[in-house]
């Protein structure tokens, strides 16, 4: 029995979502899985589209009967196509979920997403909360919980020698829609410093000298030189709870920044109602 996974064009590999996907591909390769797609990094939409189509063609020609195919979800319209090709050849499909479109971007209804996912034989959800949510909304595939994403890096965290104020580190995509709470947090910081890493933060959002915007730093460099004593996992429009659609998503989602913080050897501050809160406490 052959073991496969499908790779495609990634416009960039520095984002949390694509880093998680490429890490999983590396892990699958080391465990004897073969790539039936073509991994590429074209930034242009046209070249990226052509590269992904070539990946699909290669997959159609490469998948052997009675094999196993691992897909990383979401995969847009290609997901259903690949599931059907695999099942026509009596293959089993294992789906690793990275994001749920019906939650985050609202591009799919819950019914549409459940219908897609039910084309997989096995599904690996982020955690038990996501697993239960999928079951309650009609997913009939066999479900398993990941626990937490791996974070591959050759970098080594340096010993923390900070003896001054505690420093809270927040890393990720910084934009008003995803983390509007950042506009409020500067006003309440009294006894610690707040270091922001990522792109999209406007200079005028700096409220006082305790907020230090570091800009975008590649993850390998951040791991070896993180300026923080704690890593913050938070989304939404409030500093008292993770409210709003993206904030509520933390009840089911495993933010990849959590894995990054662990890789940086940072203790984690997280919303008590987040799906990962029990894992952090444990």
Regions from the PLM with identified roles:
Residues 223-263, 270-278:
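Nucleotide-sugar-dependent
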Residues 51, 100-115, 152, 250:
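Nucleotide-sugar donor phosphate/pyrophosphate-binding loop at the beta->alpha transition
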Residues 105-108, 119-143, 274, 278:
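A short, active-site helix/loop in glycosyltransferases that binds the activated sugar's phosphate group
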């Amino acid at each position: 029995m052959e073991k496969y996974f499908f790779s495609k064009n990634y416009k960039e590999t520095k984002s949390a979502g694509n880093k998680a996907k490429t890490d999983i591909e590396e892990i699958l390769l080391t465990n004897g899985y073969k790539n039936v797609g073509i991994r590429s990094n074209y930034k242009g939409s046209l070249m990226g589209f052509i590269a992904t189509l070539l990946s699909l063609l290669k997959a159609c020609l490469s998948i052997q009967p009675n094999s196993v195919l691992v897909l990383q979800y979401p995969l847009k319209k290609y997901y259903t196509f690949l599931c059907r090709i695999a099942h026509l050849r009596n293959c089993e499909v294992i789906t690793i979920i990275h994001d749920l479109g019906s939650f985050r971007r609202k591009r799919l209804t819950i019914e549409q997403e459940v219908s897609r996912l039910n084309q997989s034989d096995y599904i690996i959800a982020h955690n038990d909360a996501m697993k239960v949510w999928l079951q309650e909304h009609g997913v009939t595939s066999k479900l398993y919980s990941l626990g937490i994403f791996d974070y591959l890096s050759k970098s080594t965290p340096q010993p923390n020698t900070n003896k001054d104020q505690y420093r809270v580190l927040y890393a990720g995509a910084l934009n008003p829609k995803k983390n509007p709470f950042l506009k409020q947090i500067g006003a309440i910081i009294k006894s610690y410093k707040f270091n922001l890493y990522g792109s999209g933060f406007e200079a005028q959002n700096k409220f006082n000298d305790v907020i230090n915007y570091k800009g975008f730093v590649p993850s390998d460099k951040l791991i070896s030189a993180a300026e923080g004593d704690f890593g913050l996992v938070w989304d939404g429009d409030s500093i008292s709870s993770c409210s709003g659609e993206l904030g509520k998503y933390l009840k089911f989602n495993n933010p990849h920044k959590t894995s990054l913080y662990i890789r940086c050897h940072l203790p984690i501050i997280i919303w008590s109602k987040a799906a990962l809160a029990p894992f952090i406490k444990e």
